[in-house]
Amino acid sequence: METTVKVALGALALLMGASLLATRPNSHANDSATPTKAHLRLASLSTEDRRDVDYALLDQRLRMLMTKPAMVGMAVGVVENGRITFLRGYGETLAGSGEPVTPDTVFRWASVSKGVAATMVAKLAEQGKIDLQAPVANYAPDLKLPAGNENRATVGDLLSHRLGLYRNAYDNKLEEGQDPSFLRQTLVQLNPTCEPGTCWSYQNVAYDASSEMVSRTTGLPYEQAVRRYLFNPIGMASGSVSLAGLEGSRSWARPHTVGKRPLPLVDTYYKVPGAGGINSNIKDMALWMEAQMGEMPDVLDDGVLNTIHAPYVVTPSERGRLRKFLERLGTAWYGYGWRSYDYAGHHIVGHRGGINGYRSLILFDPQKKSGVVALWNSNTSQPGGLEFEVMDMLYHLPFRDWLELNKTAPAETALETEPEIGSGDSAPARKRSKG
């Protein structure tokens, strides 16, 4: 089953074709009673705007994807030329329930949440409340690194995973139920892998020091700060940073594992909200992407966006994780809470996430102000390829079956399918003037 947002129906039908908006007899359409910024921006589309994405083909590909055994529910959004041009839900919130995923269905973002924390810190830095070049100890006293490195590692080093720790340090202890604040204090017991700022290694427990510094700087709990300074001004009404926020949503997707078996909800990574705590529906994720493209300068100006999207460290092993795309994928970098890539000569920015029955992705071209977001509620990573199919449409590149829909089964254990939560890699850092 699938649903669409029927907003400004006549204008959208002209833009994407009546077939994209038509409701099939066995589908469930969703019409939101209260207009949101997403609705308003959809309604403002001009039929004269150039469209590079073939939305009929995209919808066909997504329908094919949903026939795969591991898929339960999914929501996808596309922004083109700075405006939302596609919002659609597919499948079910819970396998066998008959409850459809709609553009209003809330999912978990997992590690795509890191971009929210980095954006929040960079916004505070622009206001002069945080110095990105100052020692992280100045703002997050709970973080104690080996050899006293909290006094040498900068805030920028924290946001770009250059703290000199082995990858995913103490994730296992976090998953055992230990308190993340306590764990950050005990990182001092580890052996350093390098001097801060000189190598890269993905973190969750340590990275969440970002939420501590936001709370200490604003005087607000992290969720309230994010809501006040980011979600409310952007118009992200469904955005939340807690398990209660997810479960309290009118429509929310339940997590599933292999065989469409439901998984229990756990709050482990909500305890490190800067690393993996965000929830929202696909509408609001698309609005978030618009803001990251510079379309809401009153909320996020070019100074903040340039700071967080800049490529601070080369991550060659990311190319290993994404090796099936190497025909077009060049250098991979990490910025502040964001990955970036050279793809067919274009600089693109994004992130993936995965946690306990949820997966997510965001990828966009800041120059073209175009990109894609997706959320789904199963442990399969096969949709990781959708973003590159959309990019190929935007760049008018020859079609490649990046979704591997012609394969009988996806290679679920391949490196490129690893989620961002609980996975990472190490690489030498490239020193820059910022960071």
Where does each model-flagged region fall?
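Extracytoplasmic/secreted proteins, especially bacterial periplasmic and envelope-associated proteins
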Residues: V53, L57-M64, S111, V116-M120, ...
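Short, solvent-exposed loop/turn and secondary-structure capping segments
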Residues: L87-Y90, N168-L174, V241-G245, G384-G385
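Residue-level signature of the cytosolic catalytic core of signaling kinases
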Residues: D54, L58, T105, L132, ...
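Short active-site loop at a secondary-structure junction
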Residues: L65-A75, G96-L158, C194-V205, P273-G276, ...
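The feature captures the short pre-catalytic strand/loop hairpin that immediately precedes
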Residues: S181-T193, T257-Y270
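Second-shell loop/turn segments in exported
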Residues: S44-R51, V106-R108, D142-P146, A169-L174, ...
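Catalytic loop of the DD-peptidase/beta-lactamase superfamily, centered on the K-T-G motif
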Residues: E2-L87, T218-R228, N232, L263-G435
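Active-site helix/loop module of the DD-peptidase/beta-lactamase fold
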Residues: P103, R108-V112, L124-Y166, Y170, ...
